[in-house]
């Protein structure tokens, strides 16, 4: 693990800095920069007909202003007084026997970057306390609709603004500070180790689920207690399903003994910060001719797109470059027919590369602030989760792919207008490839990018790793 990352993470999560940034964003959006910001953490919720709690997932906006993973908590930021207050559950004698003593306010004050820690039960009293002096009382509270429990009251305030806070948080969360980048780096470090472990286990594995278990256990053993999303472990034709989740197919043909290629899209989560990495490689240790041809196209797509990345560049243009590289490669193989210009104009490559090139990443895998337009009439951009130009300290994924999904491609083949651009006889050799995707996580720098992802992707190297086991 990177010692520089460890040194950064030895400090507190910069919640106070984040609160100030959000206050500045509110002011920049036309508000007077006065008032109280209010956020709630996730509530404990019981499973139906059970005394077990459902798996807990902290609200990301709450964590951004607190650094706290405790359930049933609150945070307020008095903009005028520059005071950040965390409210955590008090000890419940009936629960101590089962779960031990909770974090005390004194311990929480040492752990978190806040000015004061109170009990969750004091939230209404403290909100009212802010308004006791009418001359200095904040007039407004900023909150998020449907994120305020029935027990909380804002009656002491003259006004409640339900519109501005979510947008301000989204704008701030797009741009990562050094601490957040260190968290994302650590998440990537752990996930790279897990991807490497899966590569080494691939040759002898019998079923997709075994390799999912290898990934999860490697992450957990290195401090990543959760996954950023459900791991995708897709062998052969399963790789044509973008978010395949079954992970339960045997890895060897019972008749021929052949082992297909594997696509693994998985990322551990470290202290709520994600990674999102995809690698593809042959389970036998040697790519088939067709699989290697597609792999080389996808790697070229990623390389050319990454060469374009720097502040001020439009993500739409980088995404379009990926399609142009895909068209060139598929023409070279004979899968496509026609001119590159006509194929691009007709959006034929969407049949083989239907998703967006990438997205913002942070506390959510598909992080906030991307401004997607799923109603875009242009099919090439409809599923692009990031629209706009890149800026320093944003974190993006770059994940081109080429897929052979019958559900998507066959309507093109049957179309009188579009079918002529695809050679079905050549295409038949590639259905078994399924899909290839290569995905890295990049921080935008002042003049380019920093690649956080270190998992091997050179085709000869991944073959060697699988062969050696």
Swiss-Prot record:
Pfam families: AMP_N, Peptidase_M24
Keywords attached to this entry: Aminopeptidase, Hydrolase, Manganese, Metal-binding, Metalloprotease, Protease
Cross-referenced SUPFAM superfamilies: Creatinase/aminopeptidase, Creatinase/prolidase N-terminal domain
Lineage top rank: taxon: Eukaryota
GO BP: proteolysis
Cofactor comment text: Binds 2 manganese ions per subunit.
The keyword Manganese is annotated on this UniProt entry: yes
Amino-acid positions noted as binding Mn(2+) 2 in the UniProt annotation, renumbered to this chain: 265, 276, 439
Gene Ontology MF annotations: manganese ion binding; metalloaminopeptidase activity
Binding site for Mn(2+) 1: 276, 399, 439
Catalytic activity: Release of any N-terminal amino acid, including proline, that is linked to proline, even from a dipeptide or tripeptide
InterPro entries with a match to the protein in the record: Aminopep_P_N, Creatin/AminoP/Spt16_N, Creatinase/aminopeptidase-like, Pept_M24, X-Pro_dipept-like
UniProt cofactor(s): Mn(2+)
EC number annotated for this UniProt entry: 3.4.11.9
Function per UniProt: Catalyzes the removal of a penultimate prolyl residue from the N-termini of peptides.
Similarity remark: Belongs to the peptidase M24B family.
Protein's recorded name: Probable Xaa-Pro aminopeptidase PEPP
Name of the gene this protein is made from: PEPP
């Amino acid at each position: 693990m990177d010692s520089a990352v460890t040194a950064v993470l030895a400090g507190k999560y910069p919640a106070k800095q984040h609160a100030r940034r959000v206050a500045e964003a509110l002011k920049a959006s036309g508000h007077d920069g006065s008032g109280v910001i209010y956020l709630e953490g996730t509530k404990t919720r019981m499973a139906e007909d059970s005394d077990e709690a459902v798996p807990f997932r902290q609200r990301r906006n709450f964590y951004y202003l607190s650094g706290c993973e405790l359930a049933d908590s609150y945070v307020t930021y008095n903009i005028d007084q520059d005071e950040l207050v965390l409210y955590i559950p008090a000890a419940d004698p009936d629960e101590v026997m089962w779960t031990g003593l909770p974090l005390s306010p004194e311990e929480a004050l040492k752990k978190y970057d806040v000015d004061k820690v109170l009990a969750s039960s004091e939230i209404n009293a403290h909100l009212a306390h802010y308004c006791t002096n009418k001359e200095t009382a904040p007039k407004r509270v900023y909150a998020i609709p449907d994120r305020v429990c029935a027990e909380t009251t804002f009656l002491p305030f003259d006004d409640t603004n339900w519109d501005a806070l979510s947008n301000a948080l989204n704008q701030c969360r797009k741009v990562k500070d050094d601490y957040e980048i260190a968290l994302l780096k650590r998440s990537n470090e752990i996930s790279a180790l897990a991807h490497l472990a899966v590569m080494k286990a691939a040759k002898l594995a019998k079923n997709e689920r075994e390799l999912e278990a290898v990934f999860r256990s490697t992450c957990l053993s290195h401090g990543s207690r959760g996954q950023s999303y459900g791991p995708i472990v897709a062998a052969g034709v399963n790789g044509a399903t973008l978010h395949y989740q079954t992970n339960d197919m045997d890895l060897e043909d019972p008749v021929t003994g052949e082992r297909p290629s594997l696509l693994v899209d998985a990322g551990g989560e470290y202290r709520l910060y994600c990674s999102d990495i995809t690698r593809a490689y042959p389970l036998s240790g040697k790519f088939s001719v067709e699989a290697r041809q597609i792999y080389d196209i996808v790697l070229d797509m990623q390389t050319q797109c990454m060469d374009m990345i720097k502040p001020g560049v439009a993500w739409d243009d980088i995404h379009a470059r990926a399609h142009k590289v895909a068209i060139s490669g598929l023409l070279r193989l004979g899968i496509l027919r026609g001119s590159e210009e006509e194929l691009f104009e007709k959006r034929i490559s969407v049949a083989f590369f239907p998703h967006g090139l990438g997205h913002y990443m942070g506390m959510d895998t598909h992080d906030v602030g991307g401004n997607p337009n799923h109603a875009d009439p242009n099919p090439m951009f409809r599923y692009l989760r990031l629209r706009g130009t890149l800026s320093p300290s944003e974190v993006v994924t770059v994940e081109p792919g080429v897929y052979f999904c019958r559900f998507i491609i066959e309507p093109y083949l049957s179309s009188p207008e579009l079918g002529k651009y695809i050679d079905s006889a050549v295409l038949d050799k590639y259905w078994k490839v399924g899909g290839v995707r290569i995905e890295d996580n990049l921080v935008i720098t002042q003049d380019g990018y920093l690649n956080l992802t270190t998992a091997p992707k050179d085709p000869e190297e991944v073959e060697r790793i699988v062969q050696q086991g």
